[in-house]
Amino acid sequence: PTGDLHCGHARNAAWGDCISRLYEASGYNNYREFYVNDAGNQIVMLGESLISRYFEHFGKEYPLPEDGYHAQDIIDIANQIAEKDGDKWLNADPAERLEYFKKTGVELELKKIEDDLKLYRCDFQNFQHETFFYENNRKRINDCLTKMADMGLTYEKDGALWFKSTEYGDDKDRVLRKSDGTLSYLTPDIANHIYKIERGYDHLINLWGADHHSYVTRMQSALTALGYPDVLKVDIIQMVRMVEDGKEV
């Protein structure tokens, strides 16, 4: 959650809501879950962007990251923090400050998303945070990696941990843990899907944007390797283009 919902998101929401209503009307135990990617570099950029605008509010300089966020909502949130907390964060510990701005940014951006979804009458029963899988020293993620290792699905190479995904339909093996100890995007995603299955769900439908189409095979190969070959279906939703007088807007 690094910004407002746009028309592309609205299309995804409408599609998912229709599928959910059909399943519910057919008597299925359907559960609607919104996955919140709040543990990656984008959230670091969100925090740094907010800090930059917060400093700007007080006439101070703090570099806006090259890959940061420039929209008006970032300025608005930074101003909210300044009005609430005053200038206490100008000289705060950098790590503590970043953590606070990340957390606050995610909370406020997600609140807007939740409010918009309510206006669409698109209700979710759970907002599943990615950071959940990093709690308790990444216990759920580590349990998942241990299970994969015990099943002979991983190997070490160049200091990194790899998944033998080519043995399960992928075009190349995938990194699970990088040589610096950080995780690839795939690893918490595998843990998330296993967590769904552990809660008793035997049919998973994911709605992803078209920019994630190459991700489908690697996720399906991971679940196949773990013994769940037919559990996941992924619908790819193309982006919406808004056109006015023949021109894209």
Indicate where each model-derived feature is located.
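NTP-dependent nucleotidyl-transfer catalytic core
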Residues: 1-249
